[in-house]
Amino acid sequence: MKKLKFNPNIYDTIRKNIKKYRKEKGMTSAQLAELVDLSHDFIRQIESEKTAYNFSVDTFYKISVALDVRLDDLIK
């Protein structure tokens, strides 16, 4: 059986894509936080490359809906 390869930096990929798509929509992190009912500080931590902060699938889903982006687009 072929061994699967996993992206060890998946959270970094998602963080960068959240920030990219948010900016493409002309949205601030505060606006995104309000849409997904999370604190502005929490969204900033998610987007920060300096913070090793992981987030739930629920949060990931809410952000994708708020940004009108498919989940798989956020992990590419």
Residue ranges and their predicted role:
Residues 2-24:
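A short, Lys/Arg-rich alpha-helix, primarily the initiator
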Residues 26-46:
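Short alpha-helical DNA-recognition segment
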Residues 50-65:
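Short, basic-rich loop-to-helix N-cap that marks the start of a DNA-contacting helix
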Residues 68-76:
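Short C-terminal boundary/hinge segments that cap the last helix of small helical domains
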Residues 17, 28, 56-59, 70:
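Residues that mark the N-terminal boundary/hinge immediately upstream of a DNA-recognition element
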Residues 23, 34, 65:
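Alpha-helical residues within the helix-turn-helix
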